[in-house]
Amino acid sequence: MSASPAEVVFDRAVSPGAPLFALVDVARESSAPHQARQAGVACESLFAGEMGELLKDVAPHVIEFPLRSRFSEWWFQQWGNSIGVLIETPASLADVRRHFRTLMTVRDDQHRKYFFRFYDP
């Protein structure tokens, strides 16, 4: 069985067995959540509740990234389109999502709140 494009790229970059996640800018690539579901990998929006429903088609998502999956094959077909970043961490999907949710807003010097698109590659 030959190596997938993901395995070729990450042969030296990824720790053996370390979980990978994609942080995807769905405003840039709206089919990412659908692609994840089709591949059977977990996918969660960074927004929740009413805001999550309102922004579901453009909200950033955290997606599990198994190296040998239809999702990773699709991801590498998008290479160069700046749709997101990959993260290697021993944390769970829920923990990764919780962490990135803390970075979603910033305040200016007058304490006004703004969305921060930190996930925009």
Model-identified regions with their sequence ranges:
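Terminal low-complexity "docking" segments
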Residues: 1-121
